[in-house]
Amino acid sequence: MLTAAQRLRRSTDFAAAVRGGRRVGRGVVVVHLTLPGTLPDVSSSKPARDTGAEQTSAPARAGFVVSKAVGNAVVRNAVRRRLRHLVRERLPGLPAGSTLVVRALPTAAHRSYQRLGVDLDAAIAAARAPRGRRSR
């Protein structure tokens, strides 16, 4: 189980991570990763140096999106539990203050635990990698 400080619970937190983070899809998961310092803190009137210090001292946080397309409530909760357990093992490897949203695609219900882990690892690694230039 993730601690309360490690969970995303407000819709504004989810929206900020999805809109401002890097989106990478691998297999049956789509990961939205926001690293510290990439999102401006518009709700604070403090100087920028103070907000940056607060962001980096906060733990990495994670949230999950499992839609009804994945299955009924039993299936969705099973997928969410497996993803939560996988993310709990990987969260300490993310920089402090980062935000991770994991979205399960409909075929995630039929994936094994090991395969979900492989997909999640690949997506997180791709999201953390520096952006390369695209050739046209």
Swiss-Prot record:
Disulfide bonds: none annotated. Keywords: Endonuclease, Hydrolase, Nuclease, RNA-binding, tRNA processing. PROSITE patterns: RIBONUCLEASE_P. Residues 39-59 are annotated as: Disordered. Gene3D superfamilies: 3.30.230.10. GO terms for cellular component: ribonuclease P complex. GO terms for biological process: tRNA 5'-leader removal. InterPro entries: Ribosomal_Su5_D2-typ_SF, Ribsml_uS5_D2-typ_fold_subgr, RNase_P, RNase_P_CS. It catalyses: Endonucleolytic cleavage of RNA, removing 5'-extranucleotides from tRNA precursor. GO terms for molecular function: 3'-tRNA processing endoribonuclease activity; ribonuclease P activity; tRNA binding. Its EC number is 3.1.26.5. Consists of a catalytic RNA component (M1 or rnpB) and a protein subunit. Belongs to the RnpA family. RNaseP catalyzes the removal of the 5'-leader sequence from pre-tRNA to produce the mature 5'-terminus. It can also cleave other RNA substrates such as 4.5S RNA. The protein component plays an auxiliary but essential role in vivo by binding to the 5'-leader sequence and broadening the substrate specificity of the ribozyme. This is Ribonuclease P protein component. It comes from Salinispora tropica (strain ATCC BAA-916 / DSM 44818 / JCM 13857 / NBRC 105044 / CNB-440). The gene is rnpA.
